[in-house]
Amino acid sequence: KNSVHIWSAVKEENRKQIEAMTDELCKEYIAKDNSLANKNDMTALFRIGYGLYVVTSNDGKKDNGLIVNTVTQLTDNPYRVAVNINKANYSHHVIQQTGVLNVNCLSVDAPFSVFQQFGFQSGRTVDKFAGEKVNRSGNGLIFLDKYINAFMSLKVEQYVDLGTHGMFICSVTEARVINDRDTMSYTYYQQNVKPQPETAGKKGFVCKVCGYIYEGDELPADII
């Protein structure tokens, strides 16, 4: 019943601003209305909070590490932690074989190079710790020398096949707090660590997990 009258011509840029304002004002109203809401908006899952972690393992010949954002404490008596890993990652195979892993909690001072080191190359073909100073926990696995605020050594107690991913349900065999810096969240990474792309005239792909940007028409076979 309410209406707004605009008595002068509206420029294109102003029209777009008005449309954007209208969309913003209506967004919450529509989402709460059962007859108007999009009830299959799976971007709602993006609102789940995630930390970012480096999971380290060893295949018997070399150390390996990968970035994950799916680490969850399940219980506290006994302590149980779940770690989900994509089956296509080499670390999934290694941890299935060995049954042990370390979870390194990245802190907010971790630079983008950490994500390049552990997220943009495969441990099948690259030694991710070559030339690095390393520390080892009681289980013999690496924990990072910097850019973490804590780490946990885990022993796999149960494996759950989730199709594309595997869930490792683990007991905690060792846990250390390194410092009091805040844990790196996925949101913090997106807003403060990930380089902002220059997209004009370029084609590429953006990883929905870590934000890595690959420029090109097709993805290489070794990028998951």
Regions found by a protein language model. Name each.
Residues 4, 106-107, 218:
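Short loop/turn and capping residues at structural boundaries
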Residues 22, 203-206:
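Secretory pathway export signals and precursors
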Residues 218-224:
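Short linker/helix segments within small regulatory modules
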Residues 1-35:
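FMN-binding flavodoxin-like domain, especially the glycine-rich phosphate-binding loop
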Residues 31-203, 214:
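Basic, polyanion-binding surface patches
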Residues 207-210, 224:
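Short cysteine-rich clusters marking metal-coordination/redox-active sites
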